[in-house]
Amino acid sequence: MHDTPVTLVGNLCADPDLSVTPQGTPVANLRLAVTPRVRDGEQWSDGPTSFYRVTCWRGLAEHAADTLAKGNRLVVTGRLRIRQYETDDGRKGHAAEVDADDLGPSLLFATATVHRTSGNGGQAASGDPPPS
């Protein structure tokens, strides 16, 4: 299976949800709302909003939980996955999810102060799969 690289720009729907796997690996789940701007004649308007679950691992997860808050506009790069699911009542659906390689605040409408951490923040080398 080939990874599909994506870059998303959108708004964080809630504060990051940080937890730790049974193996002790930090993981943060985020929900990102992405609304494209579309040209309608002489004016711009909002297109349909898409929602993505974004998963961050290790140091990136901890940094996201320490830094980000609901409403922040983010730039996310990662690998897209489409997950199939079935609800309790038997309905089937699909969900778009992104395993984040990197993320940060969008500076288009905000400013940020950067604080460097030592080392690589506990991140695996780029391209390493998340823990199983």
Residue ranges and their predicted role:
Residues 15, 35-39, 59, 83-85, ...:
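Short coil/turn motifs at secondary-structure junctions
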Residues 6, 10-12, 26-28, 50, ...:
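Hydrophobic core residues within well-ordered beta-strands of beta-rich domains
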Residues 95-105:
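A short hydrophobic beta-strand segment most commonly corresponding to one strand
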Residues 57-93:
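Beta-rich strand-turn-strand
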